[in-house]
Curated annotation (Swiss-Prot):
GO CC field: Cul3-RING ubiquitin ligase complex; cytoplasm
SUPFAM superfamilies attached to this UniProt entry: Kelch motif (SSF117281), POZ domain (SSF54695)
Subunit-level organization: Self-associates. Interacts with CUL3; indicative for the participation in an E3 ubiquitin ligase complex.
Pathway, per record: Protein modification; protein ubiquitination
Residue spans of the Kelch repeats: 292-339, 340-386, 388-433, 434-480, 481-527, 529-574
Gene Ontology BP term (one): fertilization
Keyword Phosphoprotein: yes
Modified-residue entries (Phosphoserine), positions: 501
Role of this protein: May be a substrate-specific adapter of a CUL3-based E3 ubiquitin-protein ligase complex which mediates the ubiquitination and subsequent proteasomal degradation of target proteins during spermatogenesis.
Native source species: Homo sapiens (Human)
Keywords (A to Z) from UniProt: Cytoplasm, Differentiation, Disease variant, Kelch repeat, Phosphoprotein, Repeat, Spermatogenesis, Ubl conjugation pathway
Cellular compartments annotated: Cytoplasm
Listed name of the protein: Kelch-like protein 10
A Pfam family that the UniProt record links to this protein: BTB
Length: 608
């Protein structure tokens, strides 16, 4: 376990003392200790002596309480020899007993945690664990996780283990610790549903890298590790050329039935398509998604809806997670920031909202936060840094060019510079530290203009116009470009899409979607650009498709359960309770019911 020694140290402060004592009392006793007055104990460590007060040491450590008060010990004893600790660590522990602060650095954290554990000083243990959490990286996550085998640090262990699972692909590329895992440790990692890999090829390649580090002693372990790969989810060509024909696999008799079963499962998937029953087969069971795409609210069946569905990209399934107590909302914005989903502005067929609601996806609770300065239906929303930006929209009277941003820490909205044009039904995103907004409707015509906001200068700059007018557009940053997708040009709903290069200040067309749509949700999940629902010119739709910039092609994804437009989407990564938003991997009765309920399509005209 290595950490950058140049990293800044942290002075940990324990706000709640293990034994309550006023700050003034602590300060006075520390002055007495430093002056050598009223001390009633001497702690000896490797020839070094530390004078102290027994009651102060007892206040933070059950070890010292037992040492000074046990029946077999002489309570009048003054000098104690303490083995198994260095003088430097004992000095820090005694200082902590008096001041409740301790400097924690990459150089001392391991020894300090060991010493705090030895003396049962939970304040320092907690401080060291928090420090190690903050230092987790690709190079040290395995070492930190193993370090917790020796000490009771369950939260740190969980954090480190989930870091390994969530960052597996990148960690394998750079971590020397990965190559030193035992076969059991590696097996335990790669069999987990939580392992975050976009393709199972990455798991197989990791196994090969681990074996190649010591092939003579490790090649026989291929029979233990290969069944933990979801082989039937691989592309057939990769499986046949790279797995089935691999020398380690071919030389293992135990791998032959695994290959046969994988081929059969792959054939069944190809012929019949995936079903929930496949989730019980370890060769076809999809991993849990690292990120969940939420599709929130919208316009359905002639009225706004409160429906919320969660998309599990690894299983290609939608899960109904609607909170029935929440009121319906359409033409709103959605944003994820620092653990919360924010629902911003919108319309319920009666009122135009300036209100903002915050959803905690772990606790599943909703709270109202500060309202915007303006009512904003058809609002454009995006996140940059620590702020949520809300731009344009319609307040029930006029289309807006105003913009504002929200800071969760202060729970305040602040106006920023207005845009060059009034824009409702536009869409916004962020790329390279700037906010982009494209298209929309100004009250007279659909727009093909676009502009960019510089947060440092608080200025909007007009950029190259799009190739098509687009209101009800979807805009998203994907790779190195800003994508503008679909929308309404004043006559037709569009299938077309285009990509903007900030470097060249130019737009280029990309392949068209399968279906025309406006007022849909748009997000990027697992390096794919998803478009969700919308209005096709005749009806609302539950159709979903995705674009892969690597292949420059669109693909069909699983339909939502609910036909709707005017919805908003956002992506939530790294949820601790992701299973509650993902397709069920177990075999409980009725597990498919929550995914299969569908609502009638609306053929109503959308509100303008």
């Amino acid at each position: 376990m290595e950490m950058e020694s140049a990293a800044a140290s942290t002075r940990f402060h324990q706000p709640h003392m293990e034994r309550k004592m006023s700050a003034m009392a602590c300060e006075i006793f520390n002055e007495l200790r430093l002056e050598g007055k009223l001390c009633d104990v001497v702690i000896k460590v490797n020839g070094f002596e530390f004078s102290a007060h027994k009651n102060i040491l007892c206040s933070c450590s059950s070890y010292f309480r037992a040492l000074f008060t046990s029946g077999w010990n002489n309570t009048e004893k003054k000098v104690y020899n303490i083995p198994g600790i260095s003088p430097d660590m004992m000095k820090l522990i005694i200082e902590y007993a008096y001041t409740r602060t301790v400097p924690i650095t990459p150089d001392n954290v391991e020894k300090l945690l060991a010493a705090a554990d030895q003396f049962n000083i939970m304040g320092i243990v907690r401080g060291c664990c928090e420090f190690l959490k903050s230092e987790l990286c690709l190079d040290n996550c395995i070492g930190i996780c193993k370090f917790t085998d020796y000490y009771y640090c369950p939260e740190l262990r969980q954090k480190a283990y989930m870091f390994i699972l969530h960052n597996f692909e990148e960690m394998v590329k750079v971590s020397a610790e990965f190559l030193e895992l035992s076969v059991t440790e590696l097996k335990d990692i790669i069999e987990k549903d939580e392992l975050n890999v976009k393709q199972e090829d990455a798991v197989f390649e990791a196994i090969l890298k681990w074996i190649s580090h010591d092939p003579q002693n490790r090649k026989q372990h291929i029979s233990i590790l290969l069944p933990k790969v979801r082989l039937a989810l691989m592309h057939a060509e990769y499986f046949m050329n790279n797995v089935k024909m691999n020398d380690y696999v071919k030389d293992s008799e135990e791998c032959k039935p695994v290959i046969i079963n994988a081929l059969k499962a792959m054939y069944d998937l190809n012929m019949n398509g995936p079903s929930n029953s496949d989730f019980t087969n370890p060769l076809t069971r999809p991993r849990l998604p690292y990120a969940i795409l939420f599709a929130i609210g919208g316009w359905s069946g002639g009225s706004p809806t409160n429906a919320i569905e969660a998309y599990d990209a690894r299983a290609d399934r939608w899960v109904n997670v609607t909170c029935e107590e929440e009121s319906p909302r359409a033409y709103h914005g959605a944003a994820y920031l620092k653990g919360y989903v924010y629902i911003i502005g919108g319309f319920d067929s009666v009122d135009y909202f300036n209100s903002v609601k915050r959803f905690d996806p772990v606790k599943k609770t909703w709270h109202q936060v500060a309202p915007m300065h303006s009512r904003r239906c058809y609002v454009s929303v995006t996140v940059l840094g620590n702020f949520i930006y809300a731009m344009g929209g319609f307040d029930g009277y006029v289309r807006l060019n105003t913009a504002e941003r929200y800071e969760p820490e202060t729970n305040q909205w602040t106006l920023i510079a207005p845009m060059h044009e009034q824009r409702s039904d536009a869409s916004a995103t962020t790329l390279y530290g700037k906010v982009y907004i494209c298209g929309g409707f100004n009250g007279n015509e659909c727009l093909f203009t676009a502009e960019v906001y510089n947060t440092e200068s608080n200025q909007w700059t007009v950029i190259a116009p799009m190739r098509s007018r687009r209101s009800g557009i979807g805009v998203i940053a994907y790779g190195e470009h800003v994508y503008a997708v679909g929308g309404f040009d004043g006559a037709n709903r569009l299938r077309s899409a285009e990509a903007y290069s900030p470097v060249a200040n130019t737009w280029r067309t990309i392949p068209t979607m399968f279906n025309p749509r406006s007022n849909f949700g748009i997000e990027v999940v697992d390096d794919l650009l998803f478009v969700v629902g919308g209005f096709n010119g005749f009806t609302t739709t539950f159709n979903v498709e995705c674009y892969d910039e690597k292949t420059d092609e669109w693909y069909d994804a699983h339909d939502m359960s609910i036909y709707r437009s005017a919805l908003s989407c956002c992506v939530v990564p790294g949820l601790a309770n992701v299973e509650e938003y993902a397709a069920r991997r177990d075999n409980f009765p009725g597990l498919a019911l929550r995914d299969e309920v569908k609502y009638s399509a609306s053929t109503s005209t959308l509100p303008v």
